[in-house]
Amino acid sequence: MGMISEKDRYLLLSDLCARLPYGLKCEVLCVKETLNADFIKHIINDKTFQIKPYLRPMSSLTYDEVCHLCYLQKLVGEVTRYNVEDFDTEGEVSVVLTYIGADGTPHEVFHYLIAPCKKTSLEVWDWLNENFLDFRGLIARGLALEAPKKMYKEKK
Protein backbone atom coordinates (compact mmCIF):
# COMPACT_ATOMS: atom_id res chain seq x y z
CA MET A 1 0.00 0.00 0.00
CA GLY A 2 2.82 2.43 0.85
CA MET A 3 2.18 6.09 1.50
CA ILE A 4 -1.29 7.31 0.71
CA SER A 5 -2.39 10.89 0.19
CA GLU A 6 -3.61 12.89 3.18
CA LYS A 7 -7.06 13.08 1.58
CA ASP A 8 -7.25 9.27 1.21
CA ARG A 9 -5.83 8.77 4.71
CA TYR A 10 -8.50 11.07 6.15
CA LEU A 11 -11.21 9.29 4.14
CA LEU A 12 -10.02 5.88 5.36
CA LEU A 13 -9.69 7.04 8.97
CA SER A 14 -13.19 8.57 8.92
CA ASP A 15 -14.60 5.33 7.56
CA LEU A 16 -12.77 3.14 10.08
CA CYS A 17 -13.81 5.29 13.06
CA ALA A 18 -17.47 5.19 12.00
CA ARG A 19 -17.38 1.39 11.82
CA LEU A 20 -15.39 0.79 15.05
CA PRO A 21 -18.42 -0.36 17.12
CA TYR A 22 -19.61 -2.89 14.54
CA GLY A 23 -16.81 -5.47 14.39
CA LEU A 24 -15.32 -4.48 11.04
CA LYS A 25 -12.84 -7.02 9.67
CA CYS A 26 -9.57 -5.64 8.31
CA GLU A 27 -6.33 -6.77 6.80
CA VAL A 28 -3.60 -5.33 9.01
CA LEU A 29 -0.06 -5.84 7.78
CA CYS A 30 -1.37 -8.78 5.68
CA VAL A 31 -3.20 -10.46 8.63
CA LYS A 32 -7.02 -10.57 9.03
CA GLU A 33 -8.07 -8.82 12.24
CA THR A 34 -11.14 -7.21 13.77
CA LEU A 35 -10.79 -3.42 13.96
CA ASN A 36 -10.02 -2.01 17.40
CA ALA A 37 -8.99 1.37 18.84
CA ASP A 38 -5.29 0.44 18.86
CA PHE A 39 -5.30 0.26 15.06
CA ILE A 40 -6.82 3.75 14.91
CA LYS A 41 -3.95 5.06 17.06
CA HIS A 42 -1.41 3.46 14.72
CA ILE A 43 -3.05 5.05 11.67
CA ILE A 44 -3.00 8.48 13.31
CA ASN A 45 0.62 8.19 14.47
CA ASP A 46 2.20 6.26 11.57
CA LYS A 47 1.49 7.40 8.03
CA THR A 48 2.90 4.15 6.63
CA PHE A 49 0.73 1.85 8.80
CA GLN A 50 -1.06 -0.54 6.45
CA ILE A 51 -4.68 -1.40 7.09
CA LYS A 52 -7.46 -2.23 4.63
CA PRO A 53 -11.02 -2.82 5.77
CA TYR A 54 -13.12 -5.58 4.22
CA LEU A 55 -16.24 -3.88 2.86
CA ARG A 56 -19.24 -4.98 0.88
CA PRO A 57 -19.63 -3.28 -2.50
CA MET A 58 -22.87 -1.33 -2.89
CA SER A 59 -23.84 -3.77 -5.64
CA SER A 60 -24.12 -6.50 -2.97
CA LEU A 61 -27.21 -4.90 -1.41
CA THR A 62 -29.97 -7.47 -1.13
CA TYR A 63 -33.64 -6.86 -1.90
CA ASP A 64 -34.45 -6.78 1.83
CA GLU A 65 -31.63 -4.32 2.49
CA VAL A 66 -32.86 -1.98 -0.25
CA CYS A 67 -36.38 -2.18 1.22
CA HIS A 68 -34.96 -1.32 4.65
CA LEU A 69 -32.97 1.57 3.18
CA CYS A 70 -36.17 2.90 1.61
CA TYR A 71 -37.93 2.54 4.97
CA LEU A 72 -35.16 4.50 6.71
CA GLN A 73 -35.51 7.24 4.11
CA LYS A 74 -39.29 7.30 4.69
CA LEU A 75 -40.10 6.24 1.13
CA VAL A 76 -43.57 4.80 0.57
CA GLY A 77 -44.40 1.96 -1.73
CA GLU A 78 -43.37 -1.63 -2.18
CA VAL A 79 -40.06 -2.21 -3.92
CA THR A 80 -40.44 -4.81 -6.65
CA ARG A 81 -37.02 -4.58 -8.30
CA TYR A 82 -33.88 -2.58 -7.74
CA ASN A 83 -30.47 -1.79 -9.08
CA VAL A 84 -27.75 0.08 -7.26
CA GLU A 85 -26.65 2.41 -10.02
CA ASP A 86 -23.72 4.36 -8.71
CA PHE A 87 -21.98 5.84 -5.72
CA ASP A 88 -19.28 8.42 -5.37
CA THR A 89 -16.58 9.33 -2.91
CA GLU A 90 -18.64 12.20 -1.49
CA GLY A 91 -20.97 9.69 0.17
CA GLU A 92 -23.92 9.91 -2.19
CA VAL A 93 -25.56 6.63 -3.17
CA SER A 94 -27.80 6.45 -6.23
CA VAL A 95 -30.42 3.70 -6.18
CA VAL A 96 -32.78 3.02 -9.07
CA LEU A 97 -36.01 1.35 -7.98
CA THR A 98 -39.05 0.04 -9.79
CA TYR A 99 -41.87 0.08 -7.27
CA ILE A 100 -45.62 0.06 -6.67
CA GLY A 101 -46.72 3.32 -5.08
CA ALA A 102 -48.88 3.61 -1.96
CA ASP A 103 -51.87 4.29 -4.23
CA GLY A 104 -51.27 0.99 -6.08
CA THR A 105 -49.97 2.73 -9.20
CA PRO A 106 -46.90 1.08 -10.72
CA HIS A 107 -43.94 3.37 -11.27
CA GLU A 108 -41.47 1.99 -13.75
CA VAL A 109 -38.34 3.72 -12.54
CA PHE A 110 -37.76 5.75 -9.44
CA HIS A 111 -34.31 7.23 -9.06
CA TYR A 112 -33.43 7.99 -5.50
CA LEU A 113 -30.29 9.69 -4.26
CA ILE A 114 -29.37 9.01 -0.66
CA ALA A 115 -27.40 12.10 0.24
CA PRO A 116 -25.87 13.48 3.45
CA CYS A 117 -28.16 16.52 3.41
CA LYS A 118 -31.32 14.46 3.98
CA LYS A 119 -32.68 14.92 7.49
CA THR A 120 -33.00 11.16 7.98
CA SER A 121 -29.48 10.50 6.75
CA LEU A 122 -27.87 9.92 10.17
CA GLU A 123 -29.89 6.71 10.56
CA VAL A 124 -29.02 5.75 7.00
CA TRP A 125 -25.27 6.35 7.41
CA ASP A 126 -25.26 4.40 10.68
CA TRP A 127 -27.03 1.52 8.92
CA LEU A 128 -24.61 1.60 5.96
CA ASN A 129 -21.65 1.56 8.37
CA GLU A 130 -23.15 -1.24 10.49
CA ASN A 131 -23.70 -3.34 7.37
CA PHE A 132 -20.14 -2.74 6.10
CA LEU A 133 -21.23 -1.20 2.78
CA ASP A 134 -18.65 0.74 0.78
CA PHE A 135 -20.61 3.94 0.22
CA ARG A 136 -17.42 6.03 0.18
CA GLY A 137 -15.87 4.16 -2.75
CA LEU A 138 -12.85 2.85 -0.82
CA ILE A 139 -12.64 -0.42 -2.78
CA ALA A 140 -12.35 1.45 -6.09
CA ARG A 141 -9.61 3.67 -4.60
CA GLY A 142 -7.61 0.67 -3.40
CA LEU A 143 -8.14 1.62 0.26
CA ALA A 144 -10.36 -1.37 1.08
CA LEU A 145 -10.80 -4.99 0.07
CA GLU A 146 -14.03 -6.55 -1.16
CA ALA A 147 -15.43 -8.71 1.62
CA PRO A 148 -16.05 -12.37 0.79
CA LYS A 149 -19.80 -13.09 0.59
CA LYS A 150 -20.25 -14.70 4.01
CA MET A 151 -17.64 -12.69 5.96
CA TYR A 152 -20.34 -10.68 7.73
CA LYS A 153 -23.33 -12.61 9.05
CA GLU A 154 -26.74 -11.44 7.90
CA LYS A 155 -28.61 -9.41 10.48
CA LYS A 156 -32.13 -10.57 11.32
What does each model-found stretch correspond to?
Residues 1-156:
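Structural boundary micro-motifs
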